[in-house]
């Protein structure tokens, strides 16, 4: 079985057309049109997101997802489904034979071992010379959702901070429920200090609608109450209108209200968001073998995993702040834009966060005939921490990236309808 008949679906043109329609409202004086403008723009933004997703997903083979807490069970299932007779899963990249289990897949420890979805497929993207492995990556909107996920799943929002009469959740609801607060909040964002000037921004109005939908679903605050904060309400409408006009500091301020302006989470957004800007909004990049192999120039028989963790190793995220200014801890990647190969440099820890899927090509004799296998990171139960712990400067905030990313990944693939059959490992 080859790629399905939806390869040339032209849904990208639907998305592009909808994007061109939105500015049309600016020149229309008709009162009836203007009254419906906001809701129509939201619907168009939703259609853009859905069309872009369908354009990406429809051409892909039927997918079998493998998900669950059992790492050993998942590895066995993946090996059975994707290999030939239980053989080792190997592939050739830039003329070098690499083993998935021996050279790429991390060894589990006391937390989730992997933080990326692996697609085992017979569709072989040869990549770029020197950068043979294709990796799909998060964008800024995904980063916001990861932080929303962790803030609402990993923290005790019902706790009452010292010296306060209200718990964190009640205080947040009181703040965002104030018309005066929101008015002043957006007036400040419209000031010149937050205006987009020489910087680049790759987040769009339709991304805000996607974030709004996610916040409605995940937030424990009133942001999760569709009656109080529907996607066409004042708050989300102002965010949607402003987002493409804001510099990075402005976007950090705007999105921080979604996690009640918790400094630790805003710092995570700031550090990773700046790194994501280096990828210029790309949905995928090509990476070199040294993202997995300690010395790709060694003899194949001497290949071994990167000593500080491979791109699949979610434990690498603990180095997000440690490695940001160390050029030795950076990696060069390639973005392909309109046929042009553009090299970019990003910290390896940040790339490990950004990476959401990488493709491992299967041999023709593989058991996966006619379908792809998606190996998801192992899931773990979530625990709720006290927000007071952030007063300790030694608190490792990167663990919330780990928890949020693993939790968000599976939701993302479900939302995008990228899983046709799910095998649950217990």
List the model feature ranges, each with a label.
Residues 382-426:
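Inter-motif core of Ras-like GTPase G domains
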Residues 1-70, 83-364, 368-370:
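N-terminal low-complexity/disordered regulatory or targeting extensions
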Residues 362-373, 378-387:
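P-loop NTPase motor domains
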Residues 67, 374-376, 425:
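Generic beta-strand/beta-sheet core signal
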């Amino acid at each position: 079985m080859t790629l399905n008949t939806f390869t040339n679906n032209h849904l990208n043109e639907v998305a592009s057309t909808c994007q061109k329609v939105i500015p049309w409202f600016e020149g229309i004086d008709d009162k009836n049109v203007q009254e419906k403008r906001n809701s129509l723009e939201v619907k168009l933004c939703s259609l853009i997101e859905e069309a872009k997703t369908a354009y990406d997903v429809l051409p892909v083979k039927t997918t079998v997802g493998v998900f669950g807490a059992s790492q050993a069970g998942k590895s066995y299932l993946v090996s059975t489904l994707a290999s030939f007779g239980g053989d080792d899963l190997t592939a050739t990249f830039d003329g070098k034979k690499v083993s998935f289990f021996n050279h790429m897949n991390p060894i589990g420890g006391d937390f989730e071992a992997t933080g990326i979805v692996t697609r085992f497929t017979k569709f072989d993207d040869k990549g770029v010379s020197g950068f043979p492995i294709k990796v799909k990556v998060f964008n800024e909107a995904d980063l916001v959702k990861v932080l929303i996920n962790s803030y609402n799943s990993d923290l005790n929002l019902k706790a009452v901070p010292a010296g306060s009469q209200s718990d964190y959740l009640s205080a947040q609801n009181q703040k965002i429920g104030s018309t005066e607060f929101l008015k002043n909040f957006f007036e400040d964002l419209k000031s010149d200090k937050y205006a987009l000037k020489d910087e680049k921004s790759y987040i769009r109005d339709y991304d805000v609608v996607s974030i709004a939908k996610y916040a409605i679903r995940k937030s424990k605050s009133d942001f999760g109450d569709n009656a109080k904060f529907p996607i066409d309400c004042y708050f989300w409408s102002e965010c949607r209108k402003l987002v493409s006009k804001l510099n990075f500091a402005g976007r950090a301020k705007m999105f921080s209200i979604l996690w009640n302006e918790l400094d630790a989470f805003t710092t995570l957004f700031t550090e990773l968001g700046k790194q994501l800007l280096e990828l210029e909004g790309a949905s995928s990049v090509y990476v070199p073998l040294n993202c997995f192999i300690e010395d790709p120039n060694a003899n194949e028989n001497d290949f071994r995993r990167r000593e500080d963790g491979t791109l699949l190793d979610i434990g690498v995220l603990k180095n997000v702040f440690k490695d940001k200014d160390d050029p030795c801890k950076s990696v060069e990647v390639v973005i392909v834009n309109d046929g042009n190969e553009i090299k970019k440099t990003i910290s390896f820890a940040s790339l490990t966060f950004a990476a959401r899927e990488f493709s491992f090509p299967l041999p023709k004799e593989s058991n996966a005939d006619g379908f792809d296998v998606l190996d998801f990171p192992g899931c773990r139960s979530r625990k709720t921490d006290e927000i007071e712990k952030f007063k300790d400067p030694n608190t490792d905030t990167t663990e919330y990236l780990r928890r949020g990313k693993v939790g968000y990944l599976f939701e993302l693939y479900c939302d995008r309808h990228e899983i046709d059959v799910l095998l649950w490992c217990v």
